[in-house]
Structures are given as structure tokens and as C-alpha cells.
Amino acid sequence: MTSTTSPTAVDATAVVESVAELVRENYVFPDAARQLAELLRRRNAEGAYRTGSAEELAEAVTADLRSVNGDLHLALQFHAEPVPPDRGSAVLAAMRRDFDASLGGVPRVELLDGGVAVLEIGPKMFPLDWAAQPLTAALSLVAPARALVLDLRRNTGGDPNTVAFVCGYLLDGRTHLMTMLSRQGAVAEQSWTPPFVPGARFGASKPLYVLTSGKTFSAGEELAYDLQQVGRAEVVGEATRGGAHPRDGWTVHPHLELSVPVARGVSPVSGTNWEGTGVRPDVPCDADAALDRALSLAVARLA
């Protein structure tokens, strides 16, 4: 009988060493990065990762990565399909499948009674070079509505540039949304609404409600947070998941990608972000009830 090796078989020690070094070199919080690298190496020496399964290793390492400060963007992610070797390409490959299955990230555009439009953006904030065209079409379509409900309950993150692009349709004039700080604490980048967006704007004066759930994450949270902080929208629903640190990805095995936050966002309004706390709704309610609640608020305001 000829033995075969599973395509997802894993040399745990080699993977863990790669993960430890990448975290130590790149995690946005240097002190925590050193702690985590030491923890992973110690746990490996203790036999905590003694498995031949890439999926099991991913679960165990992710639990330890999140044990120091609860950063949900720290993860060793298992992919059933082989991971492209280029940096960050595993997430992009998965995103492409979601993009094609969700009408380019705008699965719902609807006009309801009373002139209230509902626009769902999800399941991701797809890269702007993919998403600009479908978002422009959808946002231009809802521009004449009397009020807008923006549904982010199923949005689990993506591209911050897409967040700024969407905000450009909902705000008047250039608006500073977020400052990204590097590992050294220096300003790495600022996020502003664009000076021009194609198509028609909904604008800054009409009622705007943003729906959230406990699943809303990362860039989905940023869109809700940015609009809330500048006083543009009321957030309706549940507190979000609480991940505010932009991440990058490294392939460390044919089926494993390491996700590491490489910056942290700071709002020019609050001086902080939603890391660990989530975006707190202005109108708390169950996610399943959020649309009806927002519609009732919109109708009352328009009456």
C-alpha cells in the first residue's frame, strides 16, 4: 500500500516559528508583539500545537494570538483551497468570489413607501478598483430618496478606501474621517472623503440611518463609526464586533494565511476608535428589528 500525505498536512514547528517572527516584526503594538512571539514559541515547546492538521493548528494558534489583548484581526486563517503565495492575496481571492456572488457588494437596493431607500453594502467593502462602479450605480440610484437606510448588518470588513468613497456620497465637501498611525506611532496615512464622486450624491442634509449587528466588523464598522462621529447618521441595531486595526496577510503554508494588524486608526473627532468596544448604536435594538426601527424613525422624521 502506498501512503500519501494530505495536502493540508503541516509542519507545526516551522509554521509557528514563521508566525512568531512575522508578528514580532509587524504587529502594530511592539510590546504586545514581543509578548506574543514569546508565547507562541513557549506554547510550541510545550507541545500545544502537536497536530498534523493545518485547520486544527490555525484554531489553536489564533486562540493564543488573541489571548494577550483580544485583537480580532490577529489570526492564523485556514483556507480549504490552496492559498496564493503573494502577500495579501489569500483574502483577495476569497473576496473575489464574494464580489461575484453579491452584485459587486450591493445585494439590495430598494425604494420603500414614503420615499425611504434601503441600500445594503456587503458582505465586504470590496477593493475600490472593483467596487467603484457598482457602488456608484447604487448610490446614484438612491440619491433622490427622501431618507436612506444603509444596511451594514452583514458587512464584515474590507477596504478603507471604499469606506471613504461611500462617505463621499453622504457628506458635502471634503471631510477628514480617520488617521492611520504606524507601529512607531507616526502618521502613516489620513483618510478623507474624495473631492469628487461620479454620479449623484445623496448629500449631507437628508435623514440617514445605518444598521449594524454583532457581526459587523472592521471596515464595515468604520463606515458606521465615521458617519456617527461626524454627526451625519444615527446608528440603529447592535454593538458591532470591535476590530479597528488595518491588517496585512502573509502566506505561511499552502493552506494558512497569517493576519496581522499593521496600523491603528484614530478618529479626528473622538481621538480613538472602536477597537474592543465595537460601534455603539444610537438606537439599540436586535439586529433583526433594526430595519423596521430605522424605517419608523425615518417616517416620523419626514412627517
Where are these regions (language model features)?
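STAS-typified acidic loop motif
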Residues: 99, 103-132, 269-270
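Short acidic catalytic loops
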Residues: 118-122, 142-157, 211
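Terminal peptide-recognition signature
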Residues: 19, 65, 119, 150, ...
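A short, well-ordered alpha-helical element
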Residues: 127-146
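Gly/Ser/Thr-rich loop/hinge elements
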Residues: 157-207, 245-251, 262-264, 268
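Extended, small/polar residue-biased N-terminal targeting/export presequences
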Residues: 2, 30-114, 298, 302-303
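Solvent-exposed loop/turn segments at secondary-structure junctions
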Residues: 80-83, 123-127, 154-160, 176, ...
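Low-complexity, Gly/Ser/Thr/Pro-rich intrinsically disordered linker/tail segments
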Residues: 275, 279-303
